[in-house]
Amino acid sequence: MKLVVGLGNPGSQYAQTRHNVGWLVVDEVARRWGAVWHPDKDAEVAELRMGAAPGEKVLLVKPQTFMNSSGRAVGPLFAFYKLEPAALLVVQDDLDSPFGLLKFRLGGRHGGQNGVRDIIRVLGTQDFARLKIGISRPPAGWNPADWVLSRWRAEEAETLAELVRLGADAVEVWVSHGLAEGQARFNGTDLRPKPDPAPQPRVEAADAGPHHPT
């Protein structure tokens, strides 16, 4: 069995904020596989089987505790199903990666992401996989806490939709083929807009006609 946790905050006012991109990804996975969300203590969960029959059992999780207490939702599920850290994937926003980047990482510190921080605290280990989706550092003058709770801009919508689609693809690969395959296939993902090519110098055609003195 695999546990896939999408980090975010409950409430419609947070649904389209940067901090909730993990929820968007697990919602897309649930939609693809026809899984239905239902409440389970401090979380909403959706169960599915992925891959060829009978398939790998997967429990998608959206903590309902607010970000900073995500471990309160994850810990009891982790214990109930007697899981090892290798069976857990946390889908999170990442301030340290530019918007448009997506990558897997195994273990390591929380990097200031308070949902990951609390999961590490509750589980007592860092040794679980994360799927990190870049939201970029805040612009000058922004507090990071305000930035992660800000809404996506209209001009970001197309890239966001593609990131969510690829994020769901990445979750499916992790479940079916493991972390190494996920890293190989997705850690080079870069959806940042490419700058227009620099204009090339104009080359004037040589004048083949006769030259006359003025």
Curated annotation (Swiss-Prot):
InterPro entries: Pept_tRNA_hydro, Pept_tRNA_hydro_CS, Pept_tRNA_hydro_sf. The gene is pth. The record marks D93 as: Stabilizes the basic form of H active site to accept a proton. Its EC number is 3.1.1.29. The active site is at H19 (proton acceptor). It is an enzyme of class 3 (hydrolase). Residues 185-214 are annotated as: Disordered. It comes from Deinococcus geothermalis (strain DSM 11300 / CIP 105573 / AG-3a). It catalyses: an N-acyl-L-alpha-aminoacyl-tRNA + H2O = an N-acyl-L-amino acid + a tRNA + H(+). Keywords: Cytoplasm, Hydrolase, RNA-binding, tRNA-binding. Gene3D superfamilies: Peptidyl-tRNA hydrolase. GO terms for cellular component: cytoplasm. This is Peptidyl-tRNA hydrolase. NCBIfam families: pth. The keyword ATP-binding does not apply. Monomer.
